[in-house]
Amino acid sequence: LNIVQNNEFVDHRTGRFFMRTELEGIFNDTTLLADLDSALPEGSVRELNPAGRRRIVILVTKEAHCLGDLLMKANYGGLDVEIAAVIGNHETLRTLVERFDIPFELVSHEGHTREEHDNLMAAAIEAHNPDYVVLAKYMRVLTPSFVARFPNKIINIHHSFLPAFIGARPYHQAYERGVKIIGATAHYVNDNLDEGPIIMQDVIHVDHTYTAEDMMRAGRDVEKNVLSRALYQVLAQRVFVYGNRTIIL
């Protein structure tokens, strides 16, 4: 048994110790976990995750920039991930997805309540047995019952530093406020809109010469970069969720 990499963090405020260890060699999972349980204090949390490619399902509406970036990186090696399917509530992005020989499924929200539509979406997702669900500009507010089916497994990209500019037309809101930086936040989804544990953030500087459309173009670049960087860390099993925050080791 060989330790390839080991990273640790102590949160002195809460008295919590976090550790991520990469192992290689021949060992019995059950025996290793039993040995850990006997060595660790009562109440400790441990996971043993096998190496290998993770499966994701991507949810979309109409915007293509984040989806297109993930498709390109998955196809050409920028992300070691299997995209099992892309599911949308509109047909808009079907042609883009099918160019990469990935299944696109339409689960329309028309004629359904939020709860009904979320149940249909959840069933479509679960049919692919993904490790994670990625919201690539999926513009529907998820119900608590949907979120509960995928705890700490749903990753969203938000168009600002949270909780600023919640909702529609964020870059027009930013323009009206005369902001000097715009950014994006990738986070896990919880029951509170755009308030889940933050995984990754970034900003770019803008000035008074930027129109709302200029901000939108620049913001889309930040969004897709932040989402792919966050997903890279999640897929590598580097992200620990504790309370409403993350530790990345």
Where are these regions (language model features)?
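One-carbon transfer enzymes
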Residues: 5-249
